[in-house]
Each structure stands twice: as structure tokens, then as C-alpha cells.
């Protein structure tokens, strides 16, 4: 994000979690069990609330262009399927390095372990953790099925992505170019 703010790169796509460190209002998306389905979530992110959050980004050197679907975060693990609350008990679950995720997975009875994403595959492979939570598309693209036996569609947290452009880049565009983008 700092490269985007500085104008070193023009565009990026990030999870709202990264934006929550700059504006705590983005952490609303990480509250557990807020949305029943993608339709509800999309109505919020694409509606006035989501647009209001994007409107706060220019003061941080960013312009939020739109939200992209990333979906609900789900749990994979190497021990057992998760069908009920008790199934979380004792599982070491890798979570993203945002305090609310530690709180959520502690409350569920698991042992949350914050691990940076680039270290996740190795941590699962070496059994440093039993499982992890992320969106289905990430589970697929990161090949986590190679090191995880069970996928449970827990849908605890909805995780939209935000398409960002550097404000420096945005300001160099003509109004016609901005409309196209």
C-alpha cells in the first residue's frame, strides 16, 4: 500500500483487512456472522455504506475504485471436519495478523496462530498449525488442498477486496480518463 500511496505503483487489489489499519471502519467487514449470504454482503459494500468507506481513502493517498468479490472465509484443517462449534476445540488455526481474528477463533475454542500468508503453506506442511481460514479462491490458488484434508464451509467472515489506484496516478488522469477507469 505504501508503494501505491507514493505513486511507485498505479493499481493494486487488497483485502479490506489491510485498509483497516488505515481506517478502522473497514474492519466492520471482519465482524463474524454479519452477513447471511453474498447478496446481503454485496448490498452493503456496493451501497451507500461501502461507498462512504471508499470516499475516505483519498486522504490516505488512495482512490477506491470498486469492491471485488472474494467471498466468505472458510476453514481447512488436517484433523477433522468442522460441522459444529465443538469441532473447533483445540485446533491450531492460522489466522491473519489482525486482532479481531485472534478474538474470533479464540471464542470458537481453537488456538489461533497469526502467521503471515507467505509462510502459511510451509506452516501447514510442517504441521506447525492444524488448519487455516481464508476465501475459497485463495485455498485453491495457494494449493492448500495439498496439505489439508478437510474443507469446512464455515462462512464466519465475509472478505471483500478493494480495487485501488494511487491518488497521485488518479490526479494525473483527465476527467474523461477517470470515467473510463
Question: Which ranges hold each PLM region?
Answer:
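N-terminal secretory/targeting leader peptides
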Residues: 1-40, 49-180
Amino acid at each position: 500500500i505504501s508503494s501505491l500511496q507514493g505513486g511507485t505503483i498505479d493499481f493494486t487489489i487488497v483485502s479490506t483487512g489491510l485498509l483497516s489499519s488505515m481506517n478502522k471502519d473497514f474492519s466492520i467487514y471482519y465482524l463474524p456472522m454479519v452477513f447471511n449470504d453474498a447478496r446481503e454482503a454485496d448490498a452493503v459494500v456496493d451501497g451507500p455504506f461501502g461507498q462512504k468507506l471508499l470516499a475516505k481513502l483519498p486522504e490516505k493517498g488512495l482512490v477506491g475504485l470498486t469492491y471485488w468479490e472474494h467471498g466468505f472465509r472458510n476453514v481447512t484443517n488436517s484433523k477433522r471436519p468442522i460441522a459444529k462449534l465443538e469441532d473447533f476445540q483445540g485446533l491450531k488455526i492460522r489466522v491473519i495478523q489482525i486482532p479481531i481474528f485472534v478474538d474470533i477463533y479464540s471464542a470458537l475454542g481453537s488456538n489461533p496462530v497469526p502467521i503471515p500468508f507467505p509462510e502459511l503453506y510451509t506452516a501447514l506442511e510442517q504441521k506447525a498449525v492444524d488448519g487455516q481460514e481464508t476465501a475459497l479462491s485463495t485455498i485453491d490458488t495457494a494449493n492448500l488442498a495439498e496439505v489439508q484434508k478437510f474443507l469446512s464451509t464455515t462462512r464466519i467472515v465475509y472478505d471483500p477486496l478493494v480495487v485501488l489506484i494511487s491518488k497521485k496516478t488518479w490526479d494525473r488522469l483527465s476527467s474523461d480518463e477517470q470515467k473510463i477507469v
